[in-house]
């Protein structure tokens, strides 16, 4: 009889653990399955910041800055809507390093602001390119001449 009680308790414990695991698993699955990532839909330079020119907000479709930039630092902020990969980021043909990013949106994430460090350059062409991580796998480019 003691053996039967022990087996019953062991079976009940196993079923309880299975139920808890299933419940936790379902809770996690609903958080993780938000659907496919949004394709890359836009890529823009939104701000240029330098010692000489200060912070300049860039209007969409601008081909150059209106202020003369330069000095000890030069930072460029880009806005990416959707999910991109394989970044190509250059200033006057030289690679530029990302120094930070900020999420746009929350749940779901809809894009990012990226800050790039082009310090050492006084003026020239900033180029930025990314490819969507999913269909339609489009590649988007933007560039601006920094005075």
Please report, for each region that a protein language model flagged, where it lies by residue.
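C-terminal segment of classical bacterial N-terminal signal peptides
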Residues: 21-31
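Aromatic sugar-binding surface patches on proteins
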Residues: 103-116
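Aromatic/hydrophobic beta-strand junction motif of beta-rich domains
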Residues: 68-83
